[in-house]
């Protein structure tokens, strides 16, 4: 298990654009904007069944990508999410720490808790334990090793 502390990604309410609805193929309950769009849906099933149009999402005027989230239907997690970022070459990321810098504070406020368990419902899946610590978010989770090496400076 690894742990990393990152700055909170501040967000503000945003209007629901037709491009966002078209790109996701569904209407979120509400939308916020920080470094990414954050779209709240009513159910885990809705989040898991989204089949985004990545070409349309690529044409959104703001944000690096789109985070979709909903309360978890399973007791072992507080919320679920997925992250789509075709503008930066990632249709769907498996486990996105930077997205959780927005998600953990968002859900902490909604649930009145500072420590949360999250599931990123990508095809591979990702588990996070997040904690809001002032202006930082501490994330813990297991990693998938993809590169090993030595750098000499």
Tell me the role of every PLM-derived stretch.
Residues 1-153:
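Active-site proximal loop and beta-alpha junction motif in alpha/beta enzyme cores
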């Amino acid at each position: 298990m690894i742990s990393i502390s990152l700055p909170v990604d501040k967000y503000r309410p945003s209007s629901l654009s037709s491009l966002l609805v078209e790109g996701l193929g569904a209407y979120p309950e509400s939308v916020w904007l920080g470094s990414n769009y954050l779209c709240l849906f009513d159910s885990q099933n809705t989040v898991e069944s989204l089949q985004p149009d990545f070409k349309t999402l690529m044409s959104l005027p703001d944000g690096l990508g789109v985070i979709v989230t909903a309360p978890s239907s399973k007791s072992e997690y507080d919320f679920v999410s997925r992250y789509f970022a075709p503008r930066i070459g990632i249709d769907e990321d498996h486990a996105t720490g930077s997205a959780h810098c927005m998600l953990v504070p968002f859900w902490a406020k909604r649930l009145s808790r500072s420590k949360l368990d999250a599931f990123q419902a990508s095809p591979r899946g990702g588990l996070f334990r997040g904690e809001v610590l002032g202006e930082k978010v501490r994330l813990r989770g297991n990693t998938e090793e993809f590169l090993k090496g030595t750098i000499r400076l």
